[in-house]
Amino acid sequence: MNFNKLFAIVLLAALVLLGQTEAGGLKKFGKKLEGVGKRVFKASEKALPVAVGIKALGK
């Protein structure tokens, strides 16, 4: 008996049966990650002009 083929068939069957579930938990995680990205982007928008100004003064 070839274990690799059996494992591949079982894995494929599990993906087909379990792949149709809702993405509730994953969606929540994605929303949190998106919020973190927005906060980092806004903070960098505020800090970047200050950093550029300090760099210009240092020349």
From Swiss-Prot:
Domain of life: Eukaryota
Pfam families in the cross-refs: Cecropin (PF00272)
Record localization: Secreted
Main localisation: secreted
Biological processes, Gene Ontology terms: antibacterial humoral response; defense response to Gram-negative bacterium; defense response to Gram-positive bacterium; innate immune response
Free-text function comment from the UniProt entry: Cecropins have lytic and antibacterial activity against several Gram-positive and Gram-negative bacteria.
Matching PANTHER family: CECROPIN-A1-RELATED (PTHR38329:SF1)
Stated name of the protein: Cecropin-A2
Organism: Aedes albopictus (Asian tiger mosquito)
GN (gene name): CECA2
